[in-house]
Amino acid sequence: MTFTREANRFLADMRRLLRVRSYSKRTLDTYVRWAQRFLESHSSTPVDRLTRDHVEEFLAVLTTQGRLAPKSRNQATSALAFFFREALGRDELYAMPRAKESRRVPSVLSHRQVRLVLGQLSGKYRLLGSLMYGAGLRLTEAHQLRVKDIDFDLLQITVRDGKGAKDRWVMLPELLVPALRRQVARVAEQNQDDRRSGGGWAALPNALARKAPTAGYELAWQFVFPASRSSKDPATGKRGRYHLHASSTQRQVKKAASASGIPKPVTCHTFRRSFATQMLRAGYDARSVQKLMGHSDIRTTMTYVQAITDAGIGMRSPLDRRHNQD
């Protein structure tokens, strides 16, 4: 849809303010998309005359049409609260009630099931799946890894700007070292070829882009899993490679899960959940797993403990014990 000049100005302000406040690109795009949908639904009303009533009507329509789950509704509420507060300078969405999100038992895989799914993946996608399971990475964290974040000597990965803009360290599975070294070597060769043809740039964090404007050409800052095609960085106009798009990995994992024959839903996030479950079952305490997972709240980690307890994972049925004794 084509927005009015006024609406476009407010949307541009929203983008700028999200960047200034160091929101991730993913959150920025999501928030702006919700603001666009809201403005589109009330296109006949001038932006400066929109109120909380318009927001509640927008959310109610989407909810009654069955197109808005509680989690998405809360996301939309946060996005529109930011739009009103920061772009419009009005805080009338303060303390707007949130939808109650249902708590589901997380779907996890056994080690054998993980191997079945990984066995259906190949190349960089198998390596990505192995990192999500072996180090507990989120899909976005695995995609955003840069060459400098991998320490082969210490067997350590630095996760930069994870969820909540927090850095953390996770284990690098020794089993993945050879494959990761080969991937980095391919990235180095590709970067040299790109630089010879006028490319080779990797988008930098805002602060570094100002302090070291040429660092984006260095191998250390290249993405470990770059996109197959180069493009222009919208912030600098320089040609280079961004990281893989999430949809490409999600598509490959979905196909692999289907081919493996596992009768349960499997997504990229299932690898990470399975990591947490396996670590807890192995006897690691919840606080240690919380740090590895990058959970800001221990209660998030405890959902995995609860899932293990509720499902009786690791316990033995009295029928099995009796059978073994006999």
Where are these regions (language model features)?
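Conserved catalytic core of the tyrosine transesterase superfamily
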Residues: 1-326
